[in-house]
């Protein structure tokens, strides 16, 4: 038997039963069928190979803290660094800003400015 013949009959990986021994993908849990089939490459494992294997799952719920209500003056848009920019509504010098990636990743960010005096907002695409 040649090496090429052996390659077709044995798997590429030596792995735990959680993973496909042919391509390395995570295997689905055994069901009512006689074999467990890898959803990626179609490699089959006899379901009897899984006898005695215990599957344990657990769900942990973490208690959430209480949310503190924000007043209008203390909202997230009023926080952040302040730049020397004149508010077009009230003329106040000084606007807080924050940035967001609103468009596709290969385009610039959108800068949101908020007047620290009258809370007027404007945006600028950079």
Swiss-Prot record:
Q: Where does Zn(2+) 2 bind?
A: 87, 90, 115, 118
SMART domains, A to Z: ZnF_C2C2 (SM00440)
Q: Which GO terms describe its molecular function?
A: DNA-directed RNA polymerase activity; nucleic acid binding; zinc ion binding
> What is the annotated localization of this protein?
Nucleus, Nucleolus
Renumbered ranges of motif Hairpin: 106-107
Keyword annotations: DNA-directed RNA polymerase, Metal-binding, Nucleus, Transcription, Zinc, Zinc-finger
Detail which positions bind Zn(2+) 1.
20, 23, 38, 41
| A Pfam family hit | Zn_ribbon_TFIIS
Q: What CDD domains does this protein's entry cite?
A: Zn-ribbon_RPA12
Q: Which InterPro entries would you find in this protein's record?
A: DNA-dir_RNA_pol-M_15_CS, Rpa12/Rpb9/Rpc10/TFS, Zn_ribbon_RPA12_C, Znf_TFIIS
Per the record's keyword annotation, is Transcription included, yes or no?
yes
Q: Does the keyword field hold 4Fe-4S? A: no
Q: What family classification does the UniProt entry report for this protein?
A: Belongs to the archaeal RpoM/eukaryotic RPA12/RPB9/RPC11 RNA polymerase family.
According to its UniProt entry, the function of this protein is described as: Core component of RNA polymerase I (Pol I), a DNA-dependent RNA polymerase which synthesizes ribosomal RNA precursors using the four ribonucleoside triphosphates as substrates. Can mediate Pol I proofreading of the nascent RNA transcript. Anchors into the Pol I active site to monitor transcription fidelity and cleave mis-incorporated 5'-ribonucleotides.
Q: How does it assemble?
A: Component of the RNA polymerase I (Pol I) complex consisting of 13 subunits: a ten-subunit catalytic core composed of POLR1A/RPA1, POLR1B/RPA2, POLR1C/RPAC1, POLR1D/RPAC2, POLR1H/RPA12, POLR2E/RPABC1, POLR2F/RPABC2, POLR2H/RPABC3, POLR2K/RPABC4 and POLR2L/RPABC5; a mobile stalk subunit POLR1F/RPA43 protruding from the core and additional subunits homologous to general transcription factors POLR1E/RPA49 and POLR1G/RPA34. Part of Pol I pre-initiation complex (PIC), in which Pol I core assembles with RRN3 and promoter-bound UTBF and SL1/TIF-IB complex.
Record comment regarding domains: The TFIIS-type zinc-binding beta-ribbon domain contains an acidic hairpin motif (residues Asp-106, Glu-107) that likely coordinates the nucleophilic water and magnesium to cleave the scissile phosphodiester bond and release the mis-incorporated 5'-ribonucleotides.
* Name of this chain's protein: DNA-directed RNA polymerase I subunit RPA12
The species is: Macaca mulatta (Rhesus macaque)
């Amino acid at each position: 038997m040649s090496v090429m013949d052996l390659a077709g009959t044995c798997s590429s990986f030596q792995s735990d039963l959680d993973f496909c021994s042919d391509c390395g993908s995570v295997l689905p849990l055994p069901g009512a069928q006689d074999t467990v089939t890898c959803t990626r490459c179609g490699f089959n494992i006899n379901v009897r190979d899984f006898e005695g294997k215990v599957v344990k799952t657990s769900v942990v719920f973490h208690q959430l803290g209480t949310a503190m209500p924000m007043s209008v003056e203390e909202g997230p848009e009023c926080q952040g660094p302040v730049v020397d920019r004149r508010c077009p509504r009230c003329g106040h010098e000084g606007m807080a800003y924050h940035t967001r990636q609103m468009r596709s990743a290969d385009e610039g960010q959108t800068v949101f400015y908020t007047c620290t005096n009258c809370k007027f907002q404007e945006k600028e695409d950079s």
